[in-house]
Amino acid sequence: MSRVIKIQAVIDTVCPWCFIGKRRLDRAVDAFKAANSDVSFQVSYLPFELDSQRENQLNKEASYKKKFGEERFNAMLPSITKTAAGEGINLKFGGVISRTFDSHRLIWWSNQYGKQAELVEEICKLYFERNEDVADHEALANAAENVGLVKTQALEFIKSDQGISEVRDLLRQNAFRDINGVPYYIINDKYSVSGAQESDTLVKVFSQILSKE
């Protein structure tokens, strides 16, 4: 009998630790499935806005310096860049930072096609590796096309009002859960893991959860 581990990953698309966390989660899932052939995973992504009042197209580096302070940002940069590189991510801090709501809408939309994980990966790449604007509709539609979705359909969706109320509801639900930092993982609807945990740590968590189920 197959056992299922359901993971809801709460993320924001401009959070570097969410990108790092996704790579670690992917690796942990692959490793656990390889060692446990009777286990399958259902991974979905839920929205979180680190700053729901952010204006669009603010200078990315300047915004981080304003948030953390220039001295702290400069001290953090080598460490997080090195950590990201260890996960195969070429982290960059050029370009602009914008509100992430539309990127979350597109991720929500992609779920009906089974493309959420791939699209999250592609949107993170466009923002962190290519210095593109996460609120730019053309860039988001290109990301959708890159994972096998129809660009014109993605663009039509983003420019419409579809998914707005649904994503707002998901954001409210996460607020009710008292989630104040991401990434945050909800496992089998009753366990939670906070932060971009190492893959080995996540594998241990999966084992512990299955032993309780």
Regions found by a protein language model. Name each.
Residues R23-Y127:
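Structural alpha/beta surface segment adjacent to cysteine/selenocysteine redox centers
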Residues R3-V10, V14, I20-S37, F41, ...:
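C-terminal cap of thioredoxin/glutaredoxin-like
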